[in-house]
Amino acid sequence: MALKNSTDRGALERLLLSHLPRKEISTLVQSYTQPYRELMSYYRCAMMEVETKFNVLNEELSLQYDRNPIESIKTRLKSPESIAEKLQRRGFPLTVESIEENLNDIAGVRVICSFPSDIYQLADAFLKQDDITLLQRKDYIAAPKPNGYRSLHLIVETPIFLHDQKRMMRVEVQFRTISMDWWASLEHKIRYKKDLPELDHVNRELFECAQMSAQLDARMEKLQRLAETAAAEQHADSRWGERRSGPLVR
C-alpha cells in the first residue's frame, strides 16, 4: 500500500500508524520499493567507504606503533522495522525522503579499539580527512550515560561516487573498547528481555559492572604504556651497546 500525495497525507499516515502493527508499518515504508532499495544501497556504499578509511588508518598505525589499534570493525544497516518505528515515534512521514532527511543512524559503523586512547587517536585522524564532515559528536566516555554506558558517537557526512553522480550520505560511527562493547552487548541482552520488570538492583549491578569495565580499561592502558616504555628503553640500550662495541676506525 503506497501513500498518495495529497493535503490529507499527514493525517492519513497518523491514522494508519495508530492502528498498524510494526510489521505492516515496515511494509508501508518499503512500498516505494525501488527508491527505498536505491537509498539503502547508497547507505551500504557509505558504510563501505567509512570502513575502508578505518582499515587504511589501522594499517598505517600498526606500522607506526607495531600493533593494531583496531580490534574489529562492525557495520549494520538499520532494518525496515526499526526505520518505520523510529519515524513513527518521532512523528515523521513514512517516505524515502523523510528517511534521508530525518534519520542519522541508518548506516552504522562500530570501531572496536584496544584502548581508550586509540579511540581518540582514530577519531581525530578520521575527522581530519577532507571528505569527512562532522555533524554531531557525543562523548559518552568523558561523560557516561546514567546507566554507565560508554562510547564515542559521531554523525558524519561523506560522499559516495556513483557512475553519474556524487551523493553526500550520513553515517553514524561508534567507537568502543573491547570492554565497552562487551558491557553494552550484555546490558542490551539483559535489559531488553521481554516482560522483564524495571528492577533497581539489576540497574545498580549493571552500573557497577560498567564502572569495573572503565577501571579495567584504565589499568590495561597503564600496563600497555609501561610495556611500551620498557621496550623503548631496551631498544635504546641495545643501540648504545652496538655503537660502543663497533669497529674502531684507524
Where are each of the predicted segments found?
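Long beta-strand-rich cores associated with HINT superfamily self-processing modules
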Residues: E100, C113-K222
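Terminal, regulation- and interaction-focused segments at domain boundaries
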Residues: I106-C113
